[in-house]
Every structure is written in C-alpha cells, then in structure tokens.
Amino acid sequence: MASDLVESAPAKVNLTLRVLGQRADGYHDIQSLVVFADVGDRLSLTPGADLTLSVAGPGAAQTGAETDNLVVKAARALAARVRQLRAGAFRLEKNLPVAAGLGSGSADAAAALRLLARANDLAPDDPRLYEAARLTGADVSVCLDPRPRVMRGIGEILSAPLALPRLSALLVNPGVAVPTKLVFSGWKPSANPAPVSGGANDLAVLARIPNERQLLDWLMGEVNDLEAPAVALEPAIADVLASLHGAAGCRLARMSGSGATCFALFSSVAETATAAKNLRAQFPHWWISETTLG
C-alpha cells in the first residue's frame, strides 16, 4: 500500500501591495512584498491512479465543489504536461478562511504540485511545475516555494528569495468573503501614486534591511492599494483595522491581498498573544490567529 505524502500549505501575506495599472486583458499589474505565515492548511496525498479530493476542517464548507478546487485544477494542469503522471487521493485539512486575502486556495494548489513532484520524482525546480502553477492561478507560483519574495506582473514574475527578519503578527478575518475581482474593479488609478524609490520593487533596499525594527520602519512607508476599495465593499474590514490599530504594542496594521484578512505586526510574541486574547474576548466570531511571518 502506498504511503501518504504530506505538505503544509502556509498562508500567504502581502505586507505591501501596489497596483500599477490595468492591462489590455483586464488583469492588473501589481508589485507586492509577500511573506508566509506558520499557520495554514494541510494537504496529504495517497499516490494512485485516480485523482480525487476530500476536504475536512473548519473551512471545508466554504471550499465549493471538488471540480472547482485549485488542488484539482493544479493536478490536471500538471498531468497535461507530465506523461503518465501518478496522481492519487488528496485529503485537504482546510484551516484558513476562504476568499480572505491569504491565498489559501493558491497555497493548497502549490502544495498539491509539490506532492505530485515528490510522487513522480520531479525536481522542485522542474519548469513544468511552474507552468502548471501559472495556469492554475495568479498566486500559485509564489506559493510553490513559500519564502519571502517580491511578486510582480499578475503574480508570475518573482524575485529571488529574500532573507528578511521574522515578524510576530496577528491575522484577523471578520468572517466575510470579499471577491478579488470586485475589489480590483473598485481600484481607481488616480487615487494611487506611482511607486517611489525604495518601494517594494527595490530589491537592494530589502536586501540591506538587517533587523525587525528597520523592516517595520520600512513597511510603514508602504501601502496596500486594494485596502480602500475592499473597505468600500465590506466595512467590517475597517472595524478590524481600527481594532488592530488600537491594540497595545501594534506597530503596523494593514489588509493582506484583496482582503478581508488584516494583519498587525508587534515587537514581541508576548504583545501579540495579549492582543489576540483581548480581541477574541471582544469579537468571538472573528477568525484570529497568532503567527510568525517570514
């Protein structure tokens, strides 16, 4: 009997996100500093002939039909490029909220590609993995090797991994899903200045940041251009941000991706834990997770 293979699917967090403009194909070019949390989903694979997917966990009810799941889409994209690909039974433990700005579906798809690579003796840098990732979804490529990077284009242009200081953080979602397409459609170019020198595209600046304090200082000069249109769609995001800004020890609070999850950065794990405890008492229906970003 084939033994199970297991991969974690860590949450993706956009520490910065600038929208550079809309392309002729309707998509938007962005630049974003992306890091990964130590919380996420868990995906296992029992190698076999048939491709199947079962989902359990707190977020299972929000994942939709199996045929629409990015795990299945990624597996099929790779099967179209690798002759006689060995697939099997995927089991997804869905811990992250869906449509939440954490790239959880993309992280799951990337984990599926890593599992299939292991099951079929494909090298981690096999170009067919990255082609399948690109065709599966905009964020899948950056999740394939989950390390800090600058992401550009629609997500397909990636920098080399960055050795950034790790950050103590709180992730908070108010229990609402915000459709990415609607958030982008609400973005107004006139309200967003062009990126300045030292922005998220300046790899030299990021490479020279030596410690957590200087990274936090640098991040304060950055933005998420999708925050305003997301708040216009779902005012609960503003409530989350206000609560995070008001937490003792919060250095920075910002929305991740297209929302609705927001993050707050703290100088210590103790401050993060205290903020989490207080917010859970005030807002028991919110999804709240203490984490380390890196």
Can you describe what each PLM-predicted range is?
Residues 15, 43-45, 71, 105, ...:
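Residue-level signal for inorganic ion chemistry
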Residues 70, 108, 236:
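Charged catalytic carboxylate motif
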Residues 91-120, 137-138, 249-266:
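Glycine/serine-rich anion-binding loops at beta->alpha junctions
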